[in-house]
Every structure is written in C-alpha cells, then in structure tokens.
Amino acid sequence: MKKILLAIAVLMTAFSVDAQTLTGREIIKKVKDNPDGETRYAKMDLVLEKANGSKRERKVESWAMDIGEDTKTMMFFTYPGDVKGTGFLTWNYDEIGKDDDKWLYMPALKKTRRISGSSSKTDYFMGTDFTYDDMGDRNVDEDDHKFLRMETIDGHECYVVESVPKDKREIYSKRISWIRKDCFMGVKVEYYDKLGKLHRALNISDIKQVQGFWTRGKMVMENVQTKHKTILTFSDLKFDLKIDGEMFNVTKLEKGL
C-alpha cells in the first residue's frame, strides 16, 4: 500500500511540475506558433447584440496569407446591403515598434480610410466589440508574460497567463488568457483597463481540427462595461489554398469582390 501511495504521490508531483515547466512567455509563444497554414479562407457571421437584446447581423468573407513572420489579410462584407462591399485590408508586421498598415474602404462614400496606429487601438471595427488592433497579432515580446496557475474550463486543463504591455501607452493595463494545455488554443481572454477594471471578455468555443489545423469555430467578445457583445461564427474554413498575393493591395480593396 505504501508503495502504491508513493507512486501516486510521485505521479501527482510530476504532473504538477509538468504544468509549470513552461514560462508565461513560452506558453504564449506556443499559441502564436500554432500551425495554421500559409494561406487561409473563411466565411464569418457576426451578430452585434445590444444590452437591450436587439441584434444586427453582418456577413464577411476573409482571405489571409503569411509572408515570413508577417501576415496580410483582406476582408469584404457581403451582407446586409448597407455595408455590402465594405472592405478591410491589413498588413500585420511582427517587428516590434512597427505599426501595422490598415485600410478601410467604404463604398457608399467611395472613400478609403487609413487606420492610424493610435486609432487602431481605441476605435472599434465596424460597430463590433473588436478594436482594429484586435484584427492582428501582437509580437510575443511586446508584453511581459507571467504564468499564474492552472484551471479547468469545459473539461480541458488550461494555463492561465497574465500579459502586461511593455509600452505604457497601450490602452489596457493587462490581459489574462486561458490556454488549453492539449492544443495551445486560447479559450478565454480578459482585458483590463488602466484602472484595473475588467473592460472586455473574449470567450472562444467550438475548437476543432480542420485539415489538420486547430481552429476556432466561435468567438464572443463582450464589453462588460456597456453590456454590448459581438458573436462571431466561422464557417467554410480552408487552409493552404491557392491565393494570389497581389490581391492584398488598396486597388483590389477598392475594386471589391
């Protein structure tokens, strides 16, 4: 009996040590390095829900291509009619200190707006609860990451990591992320304002493999201070498809689908 108890104790210790052998930075780096193909396509259904329960729906098609550590993305709204043809182009740079390039084309005005570095952090994308900055990735070393603890969400063991921006001009004081240990996919993120109060909460579900790549099927971003939320559902996901790299420019953005 003593040998059995000792063996159990050793196993429990091993699991405990294993859960904490990765640093916060290493965990976030594994999330960023999760394979997702060189190119990607998806259809997205967005539901914008107000605190009173009223809803608006949007439909979007998206294409993305990796170029080294950088990523170019093109999105077009296809529904409803009042936003159909609206396009969003991003060139997301991994280099620290280099602002991403972002353009928003509004067909009703026949005008392309360039999104500046400062407004991309504070302005919300097309009435959603996602900022323009949310539409791209952050370099791992733009933040200091700290492993906090392990938690279980929906039966999955998760790392909990706190990320604090090194640049104090960022609008958030910190983010706390819950990351599945088995696949290094985020399932939850909390964003805290400069006063340390929870501002937004992102919940991610329907995590599965498509073409061998781990993907997110649904994301719900809620502004907990205004009670407005955006429900984003992905469909028709495709990876490593043939995409013309020349499509990721302002001319194509203004031309549309």
Task: Describe each PLM feature range.
Residues 4-13:
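Sec-dependent N-terminal signal peptides
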Residues 15-20:
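Sec/Tat signal peptide C-region and signal peptidase I cleavage site
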Residues 22-108:
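N-terminal mature ectodomain segment of secretory-pathway/periplasmic proteins
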Residues 25, 56, 135-147, 196-201:
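A short, amphipathic edge element
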Residues 62-64, 146-152, 205-207:
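Short amphipathic beta-strand and strand-loop transition segments with alternating hydrophobic
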Residues 78, 89, 101-105, 111-116, ...:
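Gly/Pro-enriched, hydrophobic low-complexity segments
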Residues 256-257:
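Short, solvent-exposed mixed-charge patches
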